[in-house]
């Protein structure tokens, strides 16, 4: 920020330097897409903080032409290069919604195809299917038997039912059949199998059930629901038993139970201690080895001792690590470049 405010600084060159640094920055797999372009974002934030300190909240109120030009340049670059740009458009008003609904025209409003495409289900983009026509089945003139649409895959039958009701209520006029993944299902107008059933549209809402088809569906999922309820009940019973054991007065416990608990506690602590000691020995070997390597590099490249700090601070600033205040970050910065007092 001080460089930008210097009287000899040319704004275009200052912005070009920042953008060049941004283009040279390498991202690894640990950098999320929201953290891209961090160099440009960092300098934009510095400018905004400077303006905030002057109680300026609008770009039109900026008096310094350098700051205004730099902010416009960096924001324009960020808009054209940012991968994630959430929409800032407000929702349609009642009047706009009425006009859009009556016209169904791709104009001033967003248009989404609900006749053929369902709403996207996160994490479900591709599916596998097989098709085998029955004996005597005939395709049309184009070789088409019909069309198949996969409406989603779910872990539990109840989830499939809820999604089917949502689709029927808001997005589709076609019947929806439920089936098991990996199991052959006959595709027919009248469905004889209980493994693939039709879910009717809800009468008064997406979650109401009524009628024989709903009863048929409930019979299909009843066994799974009962098994899940039994498992949940067993878990609750085990939790209560554990609570009783923990809250039980040691004086009321059987000697054998106390003896086993002490042995278990001692064995657990002994194993944890041995693992910690092993890790400590490994860390010590690494530190001693790296010390020798650094001493060799100091003799071969003596100038590195005077230059590494500046490069390290710049990298931290670019990556935003200089703003981290957790214990681990503070500890690493404390020991970086200095010989830690570790009794060896």
From Swiss-Prot:
One Pfam family, please name it: DUF5832
Question: Would the keyword Coiled coil turn up in this protein's UniProt record?
Answer: yes
The organism sits in which domain of life?
Viruses
Keywords, A to Z, come to: Coiled coil
Q: Which residues form a coiled coil?
A: 221-249
The family this protein is said to belong to: Belongs to the IIV-6 287R family.
Q: What is this protein called?
A: Uncharacterized protein 056L
Q: Which organism is it from?
A: Invertebrate iridescent virus 3 (IIV-3)
